[in-house]
């Protein structure tokens, strides 16, 4: 498989709806909820899928900037998301794939609630 060179005999991770591990991240609070849906243990490739739910339009967002690549897929609601100097208007079904070394993050929440999946991939040797 594509990732076989990175990891050996890794068991699949199955997470039932609502059972993801709640984690704290920069900007976590009662209006921003992170659920880790799996991760890679060992090897040179680190993959971290996370379900993010934001329930406040007034939320102050931190700026994110880190090594690796990131993929975002909008599941519910609407938001403006910035990457460098560009702003992308997300609606359900929209996605963005980018090199996460530039400043990025939600700029404005447009709906009462928005939910999106983010997958961050980094190289453990960096």
Task: Go through the PLM ranges and name each one.
Residues 1-14:
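Short C-terminal boundary/hinge segments that cap the last helix of small helical domains
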Residues 8-11, 21-26:
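Long amphipathic N-terminal alpha/beta scaffold segment
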Residues 62-65, 69-74, 88, 96:
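His/acidic/aromatic-lined binding-pocket segments of jelly-roll/cupin-type domains
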Residues 51-56, 66-81:
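Short, conserved beta-strand element in jelly-roll/cupin
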Residues 62, 81-82, 88-89, 104-111:
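Short beta-strand His + acidic residue motifs that chelate non-heme Fe in jelly-roll/DSBH
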Residues 23-62, 119-124:
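A short glycine-rich, His/Asp/Glu-containing loop-to-beta-strand
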Residues 99-100, 112-124:
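C-terminal, beta-strand-rich globular interaction domains
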Residues 84-100:
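Short acidic-glycine-tyrosine-enriched beta hairpin
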């Amino acid at each position: 498989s594509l990732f076989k060179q990175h990891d050996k005999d890794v068991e699949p991770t199955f997470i039932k709806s609502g059972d993801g591990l709640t984690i704290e991240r920069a900007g976590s609070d009662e209006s921003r909820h992170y659920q880790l849906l799996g991760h890679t243990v060992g090897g040179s490739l680190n993959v971290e899928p996370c379900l993010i739910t934001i329930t406040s339009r007034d939320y102050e967002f931190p700026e994110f900037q880190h090594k690796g690549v990131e993929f975002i897929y909008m599941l519910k609601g609407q938001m403006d998301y910035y990457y460098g100097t560009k702003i992308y208007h997300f609606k359900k079904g929209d996605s963005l794939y980018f090199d996460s070394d530039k400043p990025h993050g939600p700029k404005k929440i447009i709906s009462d609630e928005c939910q999106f999946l983010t997958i961050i991939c980094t190289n453990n040797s960096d």
